[in-house]
Regions:
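Conserved acetyl-CoA binding element of GNAT-fold acetyltransferases
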Residues: 65-76, 80, 104-106
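Conserved acetyl-CoA-binding loop-helix of GNAT-fold acetyltransferases
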Residues: 80-97, 118-121
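Conserved active-site tyrosine of GNAT-family acetyltransferases
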Residues: 123, 128
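Short glycine/proline-centered loop/turn elements that form peptide/ligand docking sites
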Residues: 114-119, 133-143
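Conserved GNAT acetyl-CoA-binding A-motif
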Residues: 95-114
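Conserved beta-strand in the GNAT
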Residues: 46, 52-60, 66-73
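Short amphipathic alpha-helix that is part of the acyltransferase structural core
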Residues: 1-30
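Short hydrophobic/aromatic beta-strand or adjacent loop that forms the aromatic wall/cage
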Residues: 42, 142-146
Length: 152
């Protein structure tokens, strides 16, 4: 079940639980802690399975008509069960109902790391379209792929 979380402390607790279980994607502690800290101020959705949280997704406004899928994680034992897609669908519905026209997401470009190749394929399967690659957005070893989606 996907639900929107409003409580700031609960948002951080869920984010910490999930992100600390996904160190392949969130191995840099400083970045991980940044997401955990910042998520309290973002639109936050959590996936609950069997009485505990299996994943979450956060949206942040990046423009008058655009939100960014700022961070998302689903615990590995729940991968390939549709939870990520459910989170994205709920985020799309909510963003559209709030009047946003576009959603974007940033990830490491396809072809750099196998784990991120799976992430890229997931975003494409959810309906995101390739927008731009910024080779040095993060650093040269991690070129940034930006995907966008119309919510109209």
């Amino acid at each position: 079940m996907i639900k929107r979380i409003q409580d700031r402390d609960e948002k951080q607790k869920i984010a910490r639980q999930v992100l600390e279980g996904l160190t392949e994607w969130f191995e840099v502690e400083e970045s991980r802690e940044g997401y955990i800290s910042d998520c309290k101020d973002w639109i936050f959705f959590a996936a609950e399975e069997d009485g505990h949280y299996a994943g979450f997704l956060c949206l942040k406004e990046t423009g008058k008509e655009t939100v960014e899928l700022a961070v998302m994680g689903v615990l590995k034992e729940y991968h390939r069960n549709g939870i990520g897609r459910q989170l994205v669908e709920k985020a799309k519905e909510e963003a559209a109902s709030l009047g946003y026209s576009f959603m974007q997401v940033k990830t490491v470009k396809m072809g750099v790391y196998e784990d991120y190749d799976r992430t890229n394929r997931f975003y494409l399967a959810c309906g995101f379209k390739e927008f731009e690659v910024i080779e040095t957005y993060w650093d040269e070893a991690n070129p940034c792929q930006i995907y966008v989606m119309s919510l109209a």
